[in-house]
Amino acid sequence: SQSGTLVNDSAAAIGDTTITMDDGSLFQVGDILEFGDASNVPSTSGAPSGFYYKVTSISTHVLTIARFNSATGKTETGGLRHAVVDNAKILRHWEFYFQFDGPPTTTDDVSAAGGSLDEMHIVVVDEDGGITGTAGEILETFAGVSQANDAKDASGNSNYYPDVIYRTSSFIYWVDHISTLTDGSAKKGTTFDNTVGDAFVVSNTSLTGGTDDFAATNA
């Protein structure tokens, strides 16, 4: 989650479905937001919170939002449930925040070796409904996997994310690291994580390179 970004909108009223930010580049379509007040970040100090909104589109600094039901994982009709003041602080969550117990930080194994920030959560989604019939359906998740090529889980198995995907995924294989990740370094003393320029950016990859197999023919 990311906190502290400010609203730049003096007229964000109940029912509004758009709201202007200081910097729209810090958000992505799919983000889940909570709005606080001008003094406090939501969920940390009693500021207005508990109402969630999903970003459905972005135009420079203007976000289009929809109410989000964290229990069902679905959007609902209606805009803001309460007026949001200018300079209100925001708590921003990843689109799949509610699929995991908490944000990724450092795995226990890497921490014990003096490393940090290796942990990742990965979600595989049926983007267009071609597998399940429902676009956006979650196919599988991988919680707490590591960027460290020698990381182990609590059972002593490799926790290196390419190995976990190869061993347990029913839908994908790993091919290469994305450009902003530390490329499979050893865990001892290594600080992992995204590069600074992408610190708030969620990595999304659409699997568009495949083709349907050929139709079966007689041998």
Model-derived segments and spans:
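Surface-exposed assembly/interface segments
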Residues: 1-219
